[in-house]
């Protein structure tokens, strides 16, 4: 698949993203693979690219405003079928058991993980995401 990969932190005008060919990602247990139809760019993406948000994963495929169709299912996925339309959340994972998760404010979870920041996002032909965050 083709993907835009951020390999270094730099100002956007220094072109820190590179178009590369990568192997198609395979969904693991509880994950779906999305064939990306569109991925928006917002200020958060620019903060990630330019290093305004510290301690994220490199290299990374940015992009968290993802829409597309389910392309493949990992084991134990029950809520989606191939061809389903999906949107992918910025929030990608939480602990599920802290006070914030239990009261429905998962975005405050101290163990939260984010699409295009901790894990690869949607600036690619394919993206793998947890079923519960699509």
Segments from the language model and where they lie:
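Short beta-strand-to-turn element immediately C-terminal to the catalytic PLP-Schiff-base lysine
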Residues: 6, 49, 71-73, 101-103, ...
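Cys/His-rich metal-chelating microdomains
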Residues: 39, 45, 89, 101-104, ...
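NAD(P)H dinucleotide-binding glycine-rich loop of Rossmann-like/cofactor-binding domains
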Residues: 94-134
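Short gly/ser/thr-rich secondary-structure transition/capping motifs
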Residues: 13-19, 51-52
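Glycine-rich beta-strand-centered segment in the early N-terminal region that forms part
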Residues: 23-39, 50-99
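Short N-terminal binding/cap micro-motifs at the start of the first secondary-structure element
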Residues: 10-16, 43-44
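Cytochrome P450 core scaffold surrounding the K-helix E-X-X-R motif
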Residues: 44-50
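Short structural boundary motif marking the start of a folded domain
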Residues: 1-4
């Amino acid at each position: 698949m083709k993907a835009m990969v951020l390999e270094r932190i730099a100002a956007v005008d220094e072109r820190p993203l590179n178009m590369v060919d990568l192997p198609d990602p395979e969904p693991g247990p509880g994950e779906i693979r999305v064939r990306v139809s569109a991925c928006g760019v917002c200020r958060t993406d620019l903060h990630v690219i330019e290093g305004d948000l510290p301690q994220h994963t490199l290299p990374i495929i940015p992009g968290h405003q993802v829409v597309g169709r389910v392309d493949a299912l990992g084991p134990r996925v029950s809520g989606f079928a191939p061809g389903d339309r999906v949107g992918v959340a910025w929030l990608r994972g939480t602990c599920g058991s802290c006070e914030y998760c239990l009261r429905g404010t998962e975005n405050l979870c101290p163990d939260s993980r984010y699409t295009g920041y901790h894990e690869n996002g949607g600036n690619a032909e394919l993206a793998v995401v947890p079923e519960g965050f699509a």
